[in-house]
Amino acid sequence: MTANKNQKKTYNFKSETKELLHLMIHSLYSNREIFFRELISNAADAIDKLKFNAISAPELYENDTNLYIRIFSNKNNNSLTISDNGIGMKYEDIINNLGTIAKSGTKEFIKTLNKNNKIKNDLIGQFGVGFYSSFIVSEKVIVKTRFAGLKENQGVIWTSDGKGTYEVNEINKKERGTEVTLYLTKDHYEFLETWKIQNTVSKYSDHISIPIELNTYDEKEKTYFWKQINQAEAIWTRPKSEITELQYKNFYKKIANDTNDPLTWTHNKVEGNQEYTILLFIPSKSAWDIWNRDNKHGLKLYVKRVYIMDDAEQFLPNYLRFVKGIIDSNDLPLNVSREILQDHKLVYNLKKSLTKKVLQVLHSLSQNVSKYEIFWKQFGLILKEGPAEDSENRTSISNLIRFSSLLNNTQKPTMSLENYVKNMKQNQEKIYFITADNYASAVSSPHLEFFKKKNIDVLILSDKIDEWMMNYLIEYNEKKFQSVSKDDKSIEKLVHEQNSQNETYQENMNDFLNRAKKTLSDKIKDIRFTHKLTNTPAMVITDSNEMSTQMAKLFSAAGQTVPTIKYILEINPNHLLIKKINNEKNEKKFKNWINFLFEQCLLAEKNTLDNPNKFIARINDLLINN
């Protein structure tokens, strides 16, 4: 409907908005006071926007730079008004912001609400629909607003009961900014009480740097006055000794839209060539959109305590995108933009410093095993992006990565590289690892039979990112990494030390190798005997310079051309099946057995075959004729 600003107009909420309102009103009862948090947060954001826009257009202040948020409790009509003298809204803003929800995450939010009526309240803030929480406690909501710089007769009033329609009209409004009046339902009258308002503000908004004032009755003077009920000082500007643990946690919950406590945090003021303050938090739970690298993330940026922007991703690398917090710089210009940040030398230096600081915080956190297990479960996969992205800090990142390992005998990733190296065998030259589709496939792989027998530990990697990560983890503590599924002299050296009979077997079974090599000449790179196997007749490995099986799978999943891998076939001369095949004089049957053996190895290695039907037919033939 086209808006005619000269008269009151009634609009219908869009269907999606109706559904959201219904769900919020009927589902979010576990913590009704969240509406307070959201409305005060919106008011603070409006004042931040005014301060930012007034840098280039000071006339927006309208000769009034005394900024505040005010709460007015009216017990005569059971209404609660939260007002601010921030940027305000235009007529079009009211229609776009309060009449329809145009945010991309709304459908996902509704879907989540439908799935779980016990949805956590932090999702309200995450999805940007906090204003609508007003209807949890109200039977009617009235919004009066005027955009800074517009005439007094260009104010706007918005009214709704949240049941499907809303009214909009122009009004005269002397003060710029926005006031939201909630007409509370009977079971929410407690929010009119001074003690309840003060407790709620203290709980959620004490850290907000803008004064929050409450209309308070002076018994002596028999009059009302505006009493400030918050500290109105940015928490990061205060000395650490004056900030309680609870205040830090509440500040985190506000900026991160999270109801969970953070795992840890760091608060530092840096002086010298660059002057800045940081307050950074490590969450205890990942955000719903953390896995999308392209989604907005980053720190809140302030310059000389003036809010500049959210999601300033230039200050931390992508693999630390889970970090929440603020940076307040004294050196960046107040008119800084995202484009300027991209190439600003100061930002580059800040990013280096902040990255090292976060890695130090994570190292300290890793000393607390139980807390670090929580961190790794939530953010380990993201941190694994680090070795490829950040060569400068690769060693520090390596110290933070946790692995499952063969000798730990558990899927839980608790092994650090420091501990692995500390427990290496005396004659062990390298750090051994195996990559697989999952933990079960890895631990049952024939590649590990020798290591199990000799009690040599192997790191087990079963996340999709692992193969890619290991291309960048070349060595640690002067020990090179080595895949057990690749040809390697250090492994052969360990095997040879344990088995001096290898040459004898080669002499006794040379004919077997020649016949097998002739049969598989176009399919394999080489064939040889090995004593790495104890229970398995044969396995395949890749040449040291060949693409690994897991990397080939990654290429294939990404739709890229995968080069043909020619494997090395390793034969266990002690196995009964190998001895049986060696005794087979019928050349046709021998070839069938060798092809079966090779295809069996490919299936174990790749979990798939190019032609499974041919493999089944071969098995059937061998069963019938033997």
Curated annotation (Swiss-Prot):
Keywords: ATP-binding, Chaperone, Cytoplasm, Nucleotide-binding, Stress response. Residues 339-553 are annotated as: B. Disulfide bonds: none annotated. Pfam families: HATPase_c_3, HSP90. It comes from the Bacteria. One of its GO terms (cellular component) is cytoplasm. Residues 554-626 are annotated as: C. PANTHER family: HEAT SHOCK PROTEIN 90 FAMILY MEMBER. Molecular chaperone. Has ATPase activity. This is Chaperone protein HtpG.
